[in-house]
Curated annotation (Swiss-Prot):
PROSITE patterns: FBOX. SUPFAM superfamilies: F-box domain (SSF81383). It comes from the Eukaryota. CDD domains: F-box_AtFBW1-like. This is F-box protein At1g15015. Residues 1-44 form the F-box domain. InterPro entries: F-box-like_dom_sf, F-box_dom, SCF_F-box_component. PANTHER family: BNACNNG10540D PROTEIN, F-BOX PROTEIN CPR30-LIKE.
Amino acid sequence: MDVTLPHHVVEDILERLPVKTLRKFKCVCSTWRSTIDSQRFKDRHMIHGQLLEDPDILLLGRWDPPSLSKNASLMTLTFDSSTMPFSFKIQTIPGKANFYKVTQSHSKSLKVVTVYDSNMEATGLVLYDMTQSERTFANFCLSFKNRETPTAYFPSLITI
């Protein structure tokens, strides 16, 4: 007896998987690959991940490239979805290079921050800081790029 799940059920299951697993599942079949590569899926996966657990946004303060070391100003902004409107706390992470990786490209205006989870695995989320006014968030595991600020995914959050 051959049992097949409807595609919308498969999509719903895939949405709940971590990025690292999705990358592997792109090889299962062409239907899964096209689903995972679709912009609609990428948007839903990101929103679903943020609804399941309180999302963290990485904030990197301005720094001088020569002093790019333990003294870099790095903080996480954690949202608490159990309160309405969202509350948040800011936690400074002094010298915790194992939670993030900052690289300076050949261009002095481009800085890259790679975010790692508590298991020291890359989350796939990368922040490119081109200038003060232009930032791009990308998740290369899902080929996701977004020039909007993270607040686009948090309608209740107002930036000052």
